[in-house]
Amino acid sequence: MGMEFDKYIRLAHGSGGVETSAILEKLIFSRVEESLKRVGNGVGIDFPDDAAAIPLPSGDYLIVTIDAYTVNPPFFPGGDIGVLAASGSINDVLMMGGKPLAMLDSVVVEEGFPMDDLSKILNSFIGVLKDEGIALIGGDFKVMPKGQLDRVIITTVGIGLARKPIIDVPRVGDKIIVSDYVGDHGAVILAYQLGGDVSMELLEKSRLRSDVKPLTRLMLPLVERYGDYIHAARDPTRGGLSMVLNDWAKVSNTVIVIDESSIPIRPEVASFAGMLGIDPLYLASEGVAVLSVDPSLTDEVITYMHSLGFSNAKVVGEVRRSEKYSGYVIMRTVTGGFRILEPPRGDLVPRIC
Protein backbone atom coordinates (compact mmCIF):
# COMPACT_ATOMS: atom_id res chain seq x y z
CA MET A 1 0.00 0.00 0.00
CA GLY A 2 2.88 2.33 0.76
CA MET A 3 4.22 2.23 -2.81
CA GLU A 4 0.76 2.66 -4.30
CA PHE A 5 0.04 5.52 -1.92
CA ASP A 6 3.23 7.26 -3.05
CA LYS A 7 2.49 6.65 -6.73
CA TYR A 8 -0.99 8.18 -6.84
CA ILE A 9 -2.68 11.15 -5.21
CA ARG A 10 -5.25 10.11 -2.61
CA LEU A 11 -7.96 12.08 -0.84
CA ALA A 12 -5.93 11.77 2.36
CA HIS A 13 -3.21 13.93 0.81
CA GLY A 14 -5.60 16.88 1.01
CA SER A 15 -7.10 16.19 4.43
CA GLY A 16 -4.87 18.58 6.35
CA GLY A 17 -3.28 15.81 8.42
CA VAL A 18 -0.02 13.86 8.36
CA GLU A 19 -0.32 12.97 4.67
CA THR A 20 -0.81 16.61 3.67
CA SER A 21 2.30 17.66 5.56
CA ALA A 22 4.28 14.85 3.94
CA ILE A 23 3.26 15.60 0.35
CA LEU A 24 3.89 19.33 0.75
CA GLU A 25 7.36 18.64 2.09
CA LYS A 26 8.13 16.14 -0.68
CA LEU A 27 6.76 18.03 -3.69
CA ILE A 28 7.13 21.69 -2.71
CA PHE A 29 9.06 22.66 0.40
CA SER A 30 12.08 20.45 -0.30
CA ARG A 31 12.39 21.88 -3.84
CA VAL A 32 12.41 25.56 -2.90
CA GLU A 33 15.72 27.15 -1.91
CA GLU A 34 15.84 28.35 1.69
CA SER A 35 16.37 31.96 0.61
CA LEU A 36 13.17 31.81 -1.46
CA LYS A 37 10.91 30.46 1.27
CA ARG A 38 10.26 33.91 2.72
CA VAL A 39 10.74 37.59 1.97
CA GLY A 40 13.46 39.18 4.10
CA ASN A 41 12.95 38.42 7.77
CA GLY A 42 9.29 37.62 7.26
CA VAL A 43 7.39 34.35 7.47
CA GLY A 44 6.73 32.07 4.50
CA ILE A 45 6.68 28.38 3.66
CA ASP A 46 9.63 27.90 5.98
CA PHE A 47 7.16 27.94 8.87
CA PRO A 48 3.97 25.88 9.40
CA ASP A 49 1.28 28.56 9.50
CA ASP A 50 -1.79 29.53 7.48
CA ALA A 51 -0.48 32.87 6.20
CA ALA A 52 2.73 34.63 5.20
CA ALA A 53 4.18 37.85 6.61
CA ILE A 54 6.17 40.25 4.43
CA PRO A 55 8.15 43.03 6.17
CA LEU A 56 7.41 46.58 4.97
CA PRO A 57 9.68 49.66 5.14
CA SER A 58 7.29 51.19 7.68
CA GLY A 59 8.06 48.40 10.15
CA ASP A 60 4.62 46.82 9.71
CA TYR A 61 4.03 43.48 8.00
CA LEU A 62 1.87 42.63 5.02
CA ILE A 63 -0.10 39.48 5.84
CA VAL A 64 -1.09 37.32 2.86
CA THR A 65 -3.00 34.05 2.79
CA ILE A 66 -4.56 31.85 0.11
CA ASP A 67 -7.04 29.00 0.32
CA ALA A 68 -9.19 26.96 -2.06
CA TYR A 69 -12.68 26.02 -0.90
CA THR A 70 -14.25 22.83 -2.23
CA VAL A 71 -16.79 22.07 0.51
CA ASN A 72 -19.40 19.42 -0.26
CA PRO A 73 -22.27 20.25 -0.09
CA PRO A 74 -21.94 23.91 -1.13
CA PHE A 75 -25.00 24.78 1.00
CA PHE A 76 -25.22 23.56 4.60
CA PRO A 77 -26.90 24.57 7.88
CA GLY A 78 -25.23 27.75 9.07
CA GLY A 79 -23.71 28.87 5.79
CA ASP A 80 -22.53 28.07 2.30
CA ILE A 81 -19.30 27.97 0.32
CA GLY A 82 -19.44 31.75 -0.16
CA VAL A 83 -19.53 32.52 3.57
CA LEU A 84 -16.83 29.90 4.11
CA ALA A 85 -14.50 31.28 1.43
CA ALA A 86 -14.71 34.81 2.79
CA SER A 87 -14.55 33.89 6.49
CA GLY A 88 -11.74 31.37 6.09
CA SER A 89 -9.23 33.77 4.58
CA ILE A 90 -10.29 36.58 6.92
CA ASN A 91 -9.60 34.30 9.88
CA ASP A 92 -6.22 33.22 8.54
CA VAL A 93 -5.14 36.87 8.37
CA LEU A 94 -6.50 37.50 11.87
CA MET A 95 -4.65 34.52 13.35
CA MET A 96 -1.37 36.05 12.18
CA GLY A 97 -2.20 39.18 14.16
CA GLY A 98 -3.26 41.08 11.05
CA LYS A 99 -6.16 43.39 10.30
CA PRO A 100 -7.87 42.15 7.11
CA LEU A 101 -8.04 44.85 4.43
CA ALA A 102 -8.65 43.29 1.02
CA MET A 103 -9.41 40.09 -0.82
CA LEU A 104 -9.13 38.56 -4.29
CA ASP A 105 -11.16 35.60 -5.46
CA SER A 106 -11.17 32.95 -8.17
CA VAL A 107 -14.49 31.26 -8.91
CA VAL A 108 -14.57 28.11 -11.05
CA VAL A 109 -18.03 26.73 -11.84
CA GLU A 110 -19.26 23.56 -13.52
CA GLU A 111 -21.29 24.00 -16.69
CA GLY A 112 -24.97 23.55 -15.85
CA PHE A 113 -24.68 24.74 -12.25
CA PRO A 114 -27.90 26.64 -11.35
CA MET A 115 -27.51 30.38 -11.81
CA ASP A 116 -29.70 31.07 -8.77
CA ASP A 117 -27.42 28.95 -6.58
CA LEU A 118 -24.31 30.74 -7.81
CA SER A 119 -26.01 34.08 -7.18
CA LYS A 120 -26.81 33.05 -3.59
CA ILE A 121 -23.23 31.90 -3.01
CA LEU A 122 -21.71 35.11 -4.32
CA ASN A 123 -24.22 37.23 -2.41
CA SER A 124 -23.09 35.44 0.75
CA PHE A 125 -19.45 35.98 -0.12
CA ILE A 126 -19.83 39.68 -0.89
CA GLY A 127 -22.11 40.12 2.13
CA VAL A 128 -19.37 38.96 4.49
CA LEU A 129 -16.87 41.35 2.90
CA LYS A 130 -19.36 44.22 3.17
CA ASP A 131 -20.08 43.49 6.84
CA GLU A 132 -16.36 43.35 7.58
CA GLY A 133 -15.43 46.42 5.51
CA ILE A 134 -13.02 44.41 3.35
CA ALA A 135 -12.39 45.45 -0.26
CA LEU A 136 -12.68 42.98 -3.13
CA ILE A 137 -9.83 44.20 -5.34
CA GLY A 138 -9.61 41.55 -8.05
CA GLY A 139 -10.43 38.03 -9.14
CA ASP A 140 -11.04 35.48 -11.85
CA PHE A 141 -14.07 33.57 -13.16
CA LYS A 142 -14.05 30.38 -15.23
CA VAL A 143 -16.48 27.65 -16.29
CA MET A 144 -15.48 23.99 -16.69
CA PRO A 145 -17.31 21.55 -19.00
CA LYS A 146 -20.00 19.50 -17.27
CA GLY A 147 -18.54 16.50 -15.48
CA GLN A 148 -15.02 17.93 -15.27
CA LEU A 149 -15.67 19.77 -11.98
CA ASP A 150 -18.07 19.09 -9.12
CA ARG A 151 -20.28 22.20 -8.99
CA VAL A 152 -18.13 25.08 -7.71
CA ILE A 153 -14.71 25.87 -6.25
CA ILE A 154 -13.77 29.25 -4.79
CA THR A 155 -10.19 30.30 -4.09
CA THR A 156 -9.53 33.43 -2.04
CA VAL A 157 -6.47 35.52 -1.26
CA GLY A 158 -6.70 37.49 1.96
CA ILE A 159 -4.53 40.56 2.56
CA GLY A 160 -3.99 42.44 5.81
CA LEU A 161 -1.56 44.48 7.88
CA ALA A 162 0.05 43.59 11.20
CA ARG A 163 2.13 45.70 13.55
CA LYS A 164 3.75 42.53 14.86
CA PRO A 165 2.73 39.17 13.38
CA ILE A 166 1.83 36.30 15.68
CA ILE A 167 4.34 33.58 14.82
CA ASP A 168 3.16 30.28 16.23
CA VAL A 169 5.81 29.25 18.75
CA PRO A 170 4.16 28.45 22.10
CA ARG A 171 6.33 28.90 25.17
CA VAL A 172 6.74 26.65 28.19
CA GLY A 173 4.12 27.61 30.76
CA ASP A 174 1.65 29.01 28.23
CA LYS A 175 -2.01 28.13 28.67
CA ILE A 176 -3.99 26.83 25.70
CA ILE A 177 -7.31 28.62 25.23
CA VAL A 178 -10.18 27.59 22.97
CA SER A 179 -12.71 30.30 22.14
CA ASP A 180 -15.80 28.14 21.56
CA TYR A 181 -17.23 24.68 20.92
CA VAL A 182 -15.04 22.66 18.57
CA GLY A 183 -16.05 20.33 15.75
CA ASP A 184 -19.44 21.82 14.82
CA HIS A 185 -18.61 22.48 11.16
CA GLY A 186 -16.99 19.09 10.66
CA ALA A 187 -19.94 17.27 12.21
CA VAL A 188 -22.46 19.11 10.00
CA ILE A 189 -20.56 18.45 6.78
CA LEU A 190 -19.90 14.82 7.70
CA ALA A 191 -23.58 14.25 8.48
CA TYR A 192 -24.60 15.64 5.09
CA GLN A 193 -22.00 13.60 3.24
CA LEU A 194 -23.00 10.36 4.95
CA GLY A 195 -26.72 10.96 4.60
CA GLY A 196 -29.00 8.28 6.01
CA ASP A 197 -31.56 8.41 8.80
CA VAL A 198 -29.10 8.75 11.68
CA SER A 199 -27.20 11.65 10.14
CA MET A 200 -30.34 13.53 9.18
CA GLU A 201 -31.82 12.91 12.63
CA LEU A 202 -28.73 14.52 14.17
CA LEU A 203 -29.23 17.67 12.10
CA GLU A 204 -32.99 17.85 12.60
CA LYS A 205 -33.19 17.10 16.33
CA SER A 206 -30.11 19.02 17.46
CA ARG A 207 -30.47 21.86 14.96
CA LEU A 208 -26.70 21.68 14.73
CA ARG A 209 -25.20 24.32 12.46
CA SER A 210 -21.77 25.11 11.10
CA ASP A 211 -19.90 27.62 13.24
CA VAL A 212 -18.50 29.40 10.15
CA LYS A 213 -17.97 33.11 10.77
CA PRO A 214 -15.24 35.77 10.72
CA LEU A 215 -13.50 36.16 14.07
CA THR A 216 -12.80 39.87 13.63
CA ARG A 217 -14.72 41.00 16.71
CA LEU A 218 -12.67 38.61 18.81
CA MET A 219 -9.19 38.82 17.37
CA LEU A 220 -8.79 42.53 16.57
CA PRO A 221 -9.48 43.77 20.12
CA LEU A 222 -7.65 40.80 21.61
CA VAL A 223 -4.49 41.44 19.59
CA GLU A 224 -4.72 45.18 20.26
CA ARG A 225 -4.78 44.62 24.02
CA TYR A 226 -2.83 41.39 24.53
CA GLY A 227 -0.91 40.82 21.30
CA ASP A 228 2.49 40.66 22.99
CA TYR A 229 1.24 37.88 25.27
CA ILE A 230 -0.35 35.70 22.58
CA HIS A 231 2.45 33.40 21.44
CA ALA A 232 0.39 31.38 18.95
CA ALA A 233 -3.04 31.64 17.33
CA ARG A 234 -4.76 29.34 14.86
CA ASP A 235 -8.25 28.43 13.71
CA PRO A 236 -8.67 24.63 13.87
CA THR A 237 -9.99 23.90 10.38
CA ARG A 238 -8.80 20.77 8.52
CA GLY A 239 -7.45 18.31 11.06
CA GLY A 240 -9.26 20.03 13.90
CA LEU A 241 -7.88 20.93 17.30
CA SER A 242 -5.61 17.89 17.22
CA MET A 243 -3.67 19.10 14.17
CA VAL A 244 -3.17 22.59 15.60
CA LEU A 245 -1.80 21.32 18.89
CA ASN A 246 0.44 18.71 17.25
CA ASP A 247 1.88 21.38 14.94
CA TRP A 248 2.58 23.61 17.93
CA ALA A 249 4.16 20.88 20.04
CA LYS A 250 6.45 19.93 17.17
CA VAL A 251 7.56 23.46 16.24
CA SER A 252 8.18 24.48 19.87
CA ASN A 253 9.82 21.20 20.98
CA THR A 254 7.44 20.99 23.91
CA VAL A 255 4.69 18.69 25.11
CA ILE A 256 1.18 20.11 25.19
CA VAL A 257 -1.00 18.59 27.89
CA ILE A 258 -4.74 19.05 27.53
CA ASP A 259 -7.67 18.09 29.74
CA GLU A 260 -10.43 16.24 27.90
CA SER A 261 -13.10 17.36 30.36
CA SER A 262 -12.24 21.03 29.74
CA ILE A 263 -12.60 20.97 25.95
CA PRO A 264 -15.93 22.53 24.87
CA ILE A 265 -17.68 19.98 22.63
CA ARG A 266 -21.42 19.86 22.11
CA PRO A 267 -22.89 16.55 23.39
CA GLU A 268 -24.52 15.85 20.01
CA VAL A 269 -21.18 16.33 18.22
CA ALA A 270 -19.40 14.04 20.69
CA SER A 271 -22.16 11.43 20.35
CA PHE A 272 -22.19 11.54 16.54
CA ALA A 273 -18.39 11.34 16.31
CA GLY A 274 -18.29 8.50 18.82
CA MET A 275 -20.87 6.54 16.84
CA LEU A 276 -18.60 6.78 13.79
CA GLY A 277 -15.42 6.03 15.73
CA ILE A 278 -14.01 9.50 15.03
CA ASP A 279 -12.34 11.66 17.66
CA PRO A 280 -14.23 14.99 17.66
CA LEU A 281 -10.88 16.72 18.14
CA TYR A 282 -10.17 15.81 14.50
CA LEU A 283 -13.29 17.59 13.24
CA ALA A 284 -12.96 21.04 11.70
CA SER A 285 -14.21 24.28 13.20
CA GLU A 286 -14.65 27.38 11.04
CA GLY A 287 -15.36 29.99 13.70
CA VAL A 288 -13.05 29.08 16.56
CA ALA A 289 -9.70 30.44 17.72
CA VAL A 290 -7.06 28.42 19.57
CA LEU A 291 -4.55 30.55 21.47
CA SER A 292 -1.33 29.95 23.39
CA VAL A 293 -1.21 32.69 26.02
CA ASP A 294 1.27 33.84 28.66
CA PRO A 295 0.11 32.29 31.98
CA SER A 296 0.39 35.58 33.86
CA LEU A 297 -2.54 37.02 31.88
CA THR A 298 -4.63 33.95 31.12
CA ASP A 299 -7.50 34.76 33.50
CA GLU A 300 -7.62 38.34 32.25
CA VAL A 301 -7.67 37.20 28.63
CA ILE A 302 -10.48 34.72 29.31
CA THR A 303 -12.54 37.40 31.06
CA TYR A 304 -12.01 39.76 28.14
CA MET A 305 -13.02 37.08 25.62
CA HIS A 306 -16.22 36.53 27.60
CA SER A 307 -16.93 40.27 27.49
CA LEU A 308 -16.57 40.16 23.70
CA GLY A 309 -19.36 37.59 23.48
CA PHE A 310 -17.31 34.39 23.50
CA SER A 311 -18.81 32.98 26.68
CA ASN A 312 -17.55 29.44 26.03
CA ALA A 313 -13.88 30.45 25.95
CA LYS A 314 -11.82 28.46 28.42
CA VAL A 315 -8.40 27.05 29.21
CA VAL A 316 -8.06 23.47 27.95
CA GLY A 317 -4.37 22.77 28.59
CA GLU A 318 -0.84 24.02 28.97
CA VAL A 319 2.58 23.89 27.34
CA ARG A 320 5.26 21.96 29.25
CA ARG A 321 8.90 21.01 28.84
CA SER A 322 9.60 17.31 28.41
CA GLU A 323 12.58 15.40 27.08
CA LYS A 324 10.61 12.18 26.70
CA TYR A 325 7.45 13.58 25.11
CA SER A 326 8.78 16.58 23.20
CA GLY A 327 6.67 17.15 20.09
CA TYR A 328 3.66 15.26 21.43
CA VAL A 329 0.19 16.19 22.64
CA ILE A 330 -0.96 14.29 25.71
CA MET A 331 -4.57 14.28 26.85
CA ARG A 332 -5.76 13.69 30.37
CA THR A 333 -8.93 11.65 29.79
CA VAL A 334 -12.23 12.01 31.62
CA THR A 335 -11.44 8.75 33.45
CA GLY A 336 -8.19 10.16 34.83
CA GLY A 337 -5.77 8.36 32.54
CA PHE A 338 -3.50 9.78 29.85
CA ARG A 339 -3.20 9.10 26.14
CA ILE A 340 -1.24 10.55 23.26
CA LEU A 341 -3.40 12.60 20.91
CA GLU A 342 -2.02 11.67 17.51
CA PRO A 343 -2.24 14.03 14.54
CA PRO A 344 -5.04 13.01 12.16
CA ARG A 345 -4.24 10.47 9.47
CA GLY A 346 -6.23 9.34 6.45
CA ASP A 347 -9.27 11.07 5.04
CA LEU A 348 -11.79 11.48 7.84
CA VAL A 349 -14.02 14.04 6.14
CA PRO A 350 -13.31 14.80 2.46
CA ARG A 351 -14.07 18.29 1.15
CA ILE A 352 -14.83 19.72 4.57
CA CYS A 353 -13.81 23.23 3.58
Enumerate the predicted regions with their spans:
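Helix-biased detector of long, well-ordered alpha-helical tracts
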Residues: 1-353
